[in-house]
Amino acid sequence: MSNVPADLRYAKSHEWLKLEADGTATIGITDYAQSSLGDITYVQLPKVGAALKAGETFGVVESVKAASDLYAPAGGTVVAVNAELDSAPDAVNRAPYAEGWMLKLKLANPADANALLNAADYGKLLG
């Protein structure tokens, strides 16, 4: 069974979003996604300052099994990327909700997070 933290919001494309106290949102891929991909070998992320729209591709994650596009669960401006993933992409496998975070967004509309799935609904999606 995949780990689905209750304090996060989830996209059907298996990205998670955490609203932070400073109004930004931290984004990564779910435990289910990293488990399905297998050992992650490379993560391509956007540059700080990039503008993203909800549902738009923001990067790529490559594993021993496949390469998969990453989709923005909400729109906004990239204010930080996890540069540690350049040298340690396996952090996404080890801790997808902690050290394996991918980027931080200044949300264009914080209410966009409400359109995402809560933990219970995401759990149902996974079966």
UniProtKB/Swiss-Prot annotation:
Alphabetized HAMAP family for the sequence: GcvH
Disulfide-linked positions: none
Protein name: Glycine cleavage system H protein
Function: The glycine cleavage system catalyzes the degradation of glycine. The H protein shuttles the methylamine group of glycine from the P protein to the T protein.
Chloroplast is among the record's keywords: no
Family according to the record: Belongs to the GcvH family.
Record CDD domains: GCS_H
Organism in which the protein naturally occurs: Opitutus terrae (strain DSM 11246 / JCM 15787 / PB90-1)
Any matching Pfam family: GCV_H
Modified sites of kind N6-lipoyllysine: 65
A GO BP entry: glycine decarboxylation via glycine cleavage system
Gene that encodes it: gcvH
